[in-house]
Amino acid sequence: MHYGMAIDTKLCFGCTACAVACKSNNNLPNNMWWNRVVTDGGKYADTARGIYPNVVMTHYPVNCQHCEKPACAAACPTGATYRDEETGIVVQDTEKCIGCGTCIQACPYEVRTLNEGEPAYAVDFPLGDFDAPQHKVNTVEKCTFCGNRIARGEVPACMELCPGRARFWGDLDDPQSDVSRAIEGRETMRLLEEEGTKPSVYYLV
């Protein structure tokens, strides 16, 4: 099994609902995001390029790419981050993490975050999934592909809450899975393929 995701850039309109769903479901501390949306457009933030009516603006939601050859795992000195061979998901073990930050430096996608201080929240009770990972001081965090939800037979929160239905999820080894069928026959790209990390997130272009 090899879990992966496809994101249709023709359907994504940059609303950031995926980022908010991720933050809420995982009860992420203040100032921490596992999911973000990058816009490819004009010279200034969130603007299109070109001259009306021929303008272009493309949105790329970015989270952990759950690489087949993760640079973060190769850099981690304690084995706290590794690729689960049964699911293909890159896991972060906070019990082993010493907060050294080498994985953050190694990741070419800039999707890892360090809890430098005691995690703080807008409210004093969990807002998200009670099975979501706990947050600890001086540990690194990242997208988990919502492993807690997958274990219950659900899909990642970012996919479930996407109003544009731009995300597809499933087993990349299964040609009949939603993600495999979404990729079939479409032009695709993966971020920074030249790094040799072999990401498990595909962008349909």
Descriptions of predicted regions:
Residues M1-V205:
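Non-ligating segments of multi-cofactor redox enzymes
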